[in-house]
Amino acid sequence: MSGDLSRCLGKGSCPPGPVPEGVIRIYSMRFCPYSHRARLVLKAKGIRHEVININLKSKPDWYYTKHPFGQIPVLENSQCQLVYESVIACEYLDDVYPGRKLFPYDPYERARQKMLLELFCKVPPLSKECLIALRCGRDCTDLKVALRQELCNMEEILEYQNTTFFGGDCISMIDYLVWPWFERLDVYGLADCVNHTPMLRLWIASMKQDPAVCALHTDKSVFLGFLNLYFQNNPCAFDFGLCNPIIR
């Protein structure tokens, strides 16, 4: 079964075979924050799965039969049913598979987590814009001010709730949905954006103790190697750090 560290499939590759019974497949990419969301949920719930990594700079033609725009992540089950868009995919996994529910059962609490996610919605694009500006040698002062403000808004939520996690006293879906961008702050050169948010820093430290987060952590040197190649438009970026394909 292909694992998280399997090499990417690119243009000219053969499509994978049918998804085995009792397994769900995720089309992913090791460094993608949106795929990271779904991989965290798969890991947290202990769902048996296989990973097919996709080369996003040289996408296989067959992949457009999985997603009309060739985006990731996509889930596929043994009935050939496809689920895409990261939040939808995560909710599907939580609804379909047994184990601890990551979204609350209570309708209001579930709605509240989705509202928190809406408050977070500016962080991903701002993080990306800051990264691009820094990599291209452009001034990103205004972008970082805007990002800090959004992170201060998240800080205020934790202060108001007086809880360690965004969903309460234990990790829940909202924490996994926002985590990928916080894991990337240091790699992107944006770690100072949480210098004045003590509750957020406590949350980050607590998240780093979670087994699913630990299992999917990518070493900073590997991430930086990926970014260096990615910004050179090198299609080998997506396999950076893999000496040989790893099958598990």
Curated annotation (Swiss-Prot):
Annotated GO CC locations: cytoplasm
GST C-terminal domain residues: 106-231
The EC number(s) this enzyme carries: 2.5.1.18, 1.8.5.1, 1.20.4.2
Keywords: Oxidoreductase, Transferase
SUPFAM superfamilies noted in UniProt: GST C-terminal domain-like, Thioredoxin-like
GO MF assignments: glutathione dehydrogenase (ascorbate) activity; glutathione transferase activity; identical protein binding; methylarsonate reductase activity; oxidoreductase activity
Function: Exhibits glutathione-dependent thiol transferase activity. Has high dehydroascorbate reductase activity and may contribute to the recycling of ascorbic acid. Participates in the biotransformation of inorganic arsenic and reduces monomethylarsonic acid (MMA).
Annotated protein name in UniProt: Glutathione S-transferase omega-2
Organism, scientific name: Mus musculus
